[in-house]
């Protein structure tokens, strides 16, 4: 009984060493994202503007995401062609040279073994002996014959004879495998050379996005341009808002993606990128910027990712260019400087002013607050809110002046009546 009690006590107290040995399953707590660990609980740190915003997509278009703890690495080998194409140039060239060198050495060794087993090495000076390959007297000559066979050079000094069936079979195998290696490696190099990644470097985005009034509506705008004379065919643009989100159930979504409408329903997202264009997003009730004002914008932790896609006119391959804007790169109350001018018989684009902006009169209220003010004043939203507010202020000033004049006239009438009564 005492032993049973002692054993139960040990189980309840928990011997860590015994648990490590006997427990077959290790329970791992889920690891929260770093941003979730920083934000929970939220009331601990309210000053979120001092933290540096981590980019999801860098300005040069590269995604700032690293894949770690990938255990199923065999999946990269199942798609070996894409894996080789995605490698850096130095590794790609190294593999290119190594593959050819290894195949030449491998088949050169087999040719030497055939000659050695047949005894050709012992009858080099015997004119009556018919070797498998003439003038093959060592491993170096076998290696050279392997290169000549696979690359179909055929100098004619070393020739296979018809008295060697195993050599004929090896010749067929090396010819077929050599063609496969050539097709694979040359195709890999061709695809890597013809990739349109470099074409995306001549597609430029403005360094800043701006928010200002356009046609009486508050809009978010950025500019895109193409530096080449050969154009992008079927160009289209998309924009997404990357922002952390916490659901009503308490779930934290660190990189929640929300679509930003840049003309999908009207067809304005289809671009003719002959000259730089300003892409506009109307801030309405469906916009994620509906409730964001000028004062609130610097406090937001968000990122706008813009994606420009199209086909390269010269090759017909699909090209994609990316960029992003964080809150510090969104200017409220600014517009882009015009870059297109009419010269003698042609239009000229001045890319020196491509990134330049100038300040303009823009309400500091959010689009929601502007809509509420417009509805109270019974003004249609399509009108210029700022101008209508100015007109409303002018009307109030005119009414005050009229009231003042009427009051002055009344005071004058009263004074005249008093004078007449005295008389």
Swiss-Prot record:
Segments carrying motif PDZ-binding: 420-423
Biological process, per Gene Ontology: potassium ion import across plasma membrane; regulation of monoatomic ion transmembrane transport
Keyword Transmembrane: yes
Subcellular location as annotated: Membrane
Protein name: G protein-activated inward rectifier potassium channel 2
Intramembrane stretches (start-end): 139-150, 151-157
Cellular component terms per the entry's GO annotation: monoatomic ion channel complex; plasma membrane
UniProt activity-regulation remark: Activated by phosphatidylinositol 4,5 biphosphate (PtdIns(4,5)P2).
Subunit text: Associates with KCNJ3/GIRK1 or KCNJ5/GRIK4 to form a G-protein-activated heteromultimer pore-forming unit. The resulting inward current is much larger. Interacts (via PDZ-binding motif) with SNX27 (via PDZ domain); the interaction is required when endocytosed to prevent degradation in lysosomes and promote recycling to the plasma membrane.
Annotated catalysed reactions: K(+)(in) = K(+)(out)
GO molecular function: G-protein activated inward rectifier potassium channel activity; inward rectifier potassium channel activity
Bilayer-crossing regions: 90-114, 167-188
Extracellular side: 115-138, 158-166
Site positions per UniProt: Role in the control of polyamine-mediated channel gating and in the blocking by intracellular magnesium: 182
Membrane topology label: Multi-pass membrane protein
Chief location: membrane
SUPFAM superfamilies per UniProt: E set domains, Voltage-gated potassium channels
Region (Disordered): 390-423
All ranges on the Cytoplasmic side of the membrane: 1-89, 189-423
Role description: Inward rectifier potassium channels are characterized by a greater tendency to allow potassium to flow into the cell rather than out of it. Their voltage dependence is regulated by the concentration of extracellular potassium; as external potassium is raised, the voltage range of the channel opening shifts to more positive voltages. The inward rectification is mainly due to the blockage of outward current by internal magnesium. This potassium channel may be involved in the regulation of insulin secretion by glucose and/or neurotransmitters acting through G-protein-coupled receptors.
Domain of life, source organism: Eukaryota
Motif interval(s): Selectivity filter: 152-157
Keywords, ordered alphabetically: Ion channel, Ion transport, Membrane, Phosphoprotein, Potassium, Potassium transport, Transmembrane, Transmembrane helix, Transport, Voltage-gated channel
Record family assignment: Belongs to the inward rectifier-type potassium channel (TC 1.A.2.1) family. KCNJ6 subfamily.
């Amino acid at each position: 009984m005492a032993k049973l009690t002692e054993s139960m006590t040990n189980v309840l107290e928990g011997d860590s060493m015994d648990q490590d040995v006997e427990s077959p399953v290790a329970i791992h707590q889920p690891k929260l994202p770093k941003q979730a660990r920083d934000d929970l609980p939220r009331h601990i740190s309210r000053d979120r503007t001092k933290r540096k915003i981590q980019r999801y997509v860098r300005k040069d278009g590269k995604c700032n995401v690293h894949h770690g703890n990938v255990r199923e690495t065999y999946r990269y080998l199942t798609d070996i062609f894409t894996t080789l194409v995605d490698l850096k140039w130095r590794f790609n060239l190294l593999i290119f040279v190594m593959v050819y060198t290894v195949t030449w050495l491998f088949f050169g060794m087999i040719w030497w073994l055939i000659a050695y087993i047949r005894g050709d090495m012992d009858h080099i000076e015997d004119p009556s002996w018919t070797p498998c390959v003439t003038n093959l007297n060592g491993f170096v000559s076998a290696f050279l014959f392997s290169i000549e066979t696979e690359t179909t050079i055929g100098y004619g000094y070393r020739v296979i004879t018809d008295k060697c069936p195993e050599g004929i079979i090896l010749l067929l195998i090396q010819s077929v495998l050599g063609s496969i290696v050539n097709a694979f490696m040359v195709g890999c190099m061709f695809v890597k050379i013809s990739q349109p990644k470099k074409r995306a470097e001549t597609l430029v985005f403005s360094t800043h996005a701006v928010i200002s009034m356009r046609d009486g509506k508050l809009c978010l705008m950025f500019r895109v341009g193409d530096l080449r004379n050969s154009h992008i065919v079927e160009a289209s643009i998309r924009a997404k808002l990357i922002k952390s989100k916490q659901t009503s159930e308490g779930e934290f979504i660190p990189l929640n993606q929300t679509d930003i409408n840049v003309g999908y329903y009207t067809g304005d997202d289809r671009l003719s990128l002959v000259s730089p264009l300003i892409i506009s997003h109307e801030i309405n009730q469906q916009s994620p910027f509906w409730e964001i004002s000028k004062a609130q914008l610097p406090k937001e932790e968000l990122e706008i990712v813009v994606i420009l896609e199209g086909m390269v006119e010269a090759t017909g391959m699909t090209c994609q260019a990316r960029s992003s804007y964080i809150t510090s790169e969104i200017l409220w109350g600014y517009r882009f400087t015009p870059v297109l001018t009419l010269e003698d018989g042609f239009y000229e684009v001045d890319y020196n002013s491509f990134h330049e902006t100038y300040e303009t009169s823009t309400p500091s209220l959010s689009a929601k607050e502007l809509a509420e003010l417009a509805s109270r004043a019974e003004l249609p939203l399509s009108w210029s809110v700022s101008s209508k507010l100015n007109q409303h202020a002018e009307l109030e000033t005119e009414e005050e002046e009229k009231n003042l004049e009427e009051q002055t006239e009344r005071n004058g009438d009263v004074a005249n009546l008093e004078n007449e009564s005295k008389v």
